[in-house]
Amino acid sequence: NFDWWIKRFKRQFELVDILRLDHFRALSGFWRIDGKSKNAKEGTWVESPGKELLHSLKDFLNVKILPIIAEDLGIINQEVTDLRRDFSLPGMKILQFAFDGNEDNPYLPKNIVENNCVVYTGTHDNSTTISWWNDLDENIKENINKNCNLSKDTSWALIQLGMRTKAKLF
């Protein structure tokens, strides 16, 4: 009945209006590793009851749309995307991931066509924007400047770039 999860979400929603659910991917499936395994390579993907959990949470909160942002980064398959879309949860777009020179990169601002997402300059797993910028190869910096005219204040330029995307939230 997801009692532990429901209590945890209930408490969080007493503190905040919206949650970013880290590792949302695990609500579709997770990598199970036997406790006796010597490394994580020996695991298998296992389907998880995320859909049932999200339905239970919606019922408990009595809402049409859950106030959750899905961290849909990493190994994301169609099942994860479908789960996020089935519950109208916004996903995440990270500008620091955008500028690898691939014109089809889904994080490139011009390729953010879905508005049900949140654009971030980076995440808690990344360096700060200025540290990220300072550590970049000059070729990548040139590629970024092709996509946006960065001023001396890189952080603000990326914020402005993110705010110009079609994303609902920044």
Protein language model annotation of sequence segments:
Residues N1-L169:
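Alpha-amylase-like alpha-glycosidases and glucanotransferases acting on alpha-linked glucans and related
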